């Protein structure tokens, strides 16, 4: 954000010293048609819903709630200018905001306009309706049907449905897909992904990977016992190794020493970071890539093609292994990939499932871990509480982890939840409204993209007692040393809610719990450098080198 524009913005907004940086994790609903449609109310709405309009007025229009509500065009928000609308605010030189600063905008909008804000006039996009009322967010979630429309990345939609329609066809997966195609695909993979027996199967393999990672960390320490400046790349390697073990049924070799820049694991990491961290640029700036292949779009497609090739390679390997293996010799619980291949008889389904898990998982989990480690290193009192809990549960630091042991790690889990509340990696969620609604006393037409910036609501005193204080004990029950207070269940939802809740959430939780348990039982983490601000790339995380000091305890 250039200084002049930021100064002009702040002159109309009162920002407190504890302002939380936050932004919705929402990138618009894309389609083969590039333009948003204009409704009769003058609002740009999602083109996906245009074909489903009924001639008769919706039932809600006859209710007193609707008739007493204010019209949509009276919802407060930044005013668009002719031709450029509000898109100019994100443009270089003349704009008010940069992509990395966009986290601040959600909180600024709330401070300026209140609990509901209309951000319209975005070229090629539906209106964004920011909702800062947890009760209204709950109402939106609870009123959705069996196929909620979650706004997704138009760039990914175009890649799946146009650029690589030859591969995906009618099997788009669970990311960037909506309606019956989404419901059918999710129903085919949901059971094996969410089964507790599947989760338990990966505890020991993920623990081994994490132990290998910690050995590598020790080898990376310098003479001051500090980790290197690019330690976030090492966390990405750990995350990729974990996801590869789950989604591709293999060890990718990410944690090997002297990994070359052109090695497959590093290429996967680089491709994921590029693809995901440029999504905000692709989506929030003028979408020229919709009309002609820009350099950024061309590289995005190249990276996505690389992902597809990697997934196909390892899923085909798993399929061949199943074909040649004597069924009578299979022992124990089948792997996730094996379950999907055996139940669906279609390796493409397993390939697309793996692709979606990797795309969504690598950067999300990596950045969440970066944030958690930074908070641990800068909060020694909280770190010590977790260490004491782990020392009590694991007197012998070499004791293998089990699900019952993880279930007793209340302080560790409370710490994770508190980091998500105050510094949530996924900084918001949203829905494209499937029908006309009344929200915060306004008439809102279907097709509008409702944004739920939970990192704002999760830090509002209205919904959380002593919201500005980092207090993991708020998540614990009294018998476990907790100090419960007011905590609205829809104020902080890092994994979303309902039918479109994050499919890989149980694996994400398992990976993070294993890493923190193994790390904090055996090591002390410190950060002795300049405090880091948080910024948005694709995720919300500390912006700077994570030069942690890591010593055995």
From Swiss-Prot:
Necessary cofactors: heme
Enzyme class: oxidoreductase
Recorded GO CC terms: mitochondrial membrane
SUPFAM superfamilies: Cytochrome P450
Protein origin, superkingdom: Eukaryota
InterPro entries in alphabetical order: CYP11_CYP27_families, Cyt_P450, Cyt_P450_E_grp-I, Cyt_P450_sf
Pfam families associated with the record: p450 (PF00067)
Residues that, per the record, bind heme: 502
Enzyme Commission number(s) from the entry: 1.14.-.-
MF terms (GO), sorted A to Z: heme binding; iron ion binding; monooxygenase activity; oxidoreductase activity, acting on paired donors, with incorporation or reduction of molecular oxygen
GO biological process: tergite morphogenesis
Compartments it resides in: Mitochondrion membrane
Keywords: Heme, Iron, Membrane, Metal-binding, Mitochondrion, Monooxygenase, Oxidoreductase, Transit peptide
Gene3D superfamilies (UniProt xref): Cytochrome P450
Record family assignment: Belongs to the cytochrome P450 family.
PANTHER family listed in its UniProt record: CYTOCHROME P450 (PTHR24279:SF120)
Name of protein: Probable cytochrome P450 301a1, mitochondrial
Source species: Drosophila melanogaster (Fruit fly)
Lineage of source species: Eukaryota, Metazoa, Ecdysozoa, Arthropoda, Hexapoda
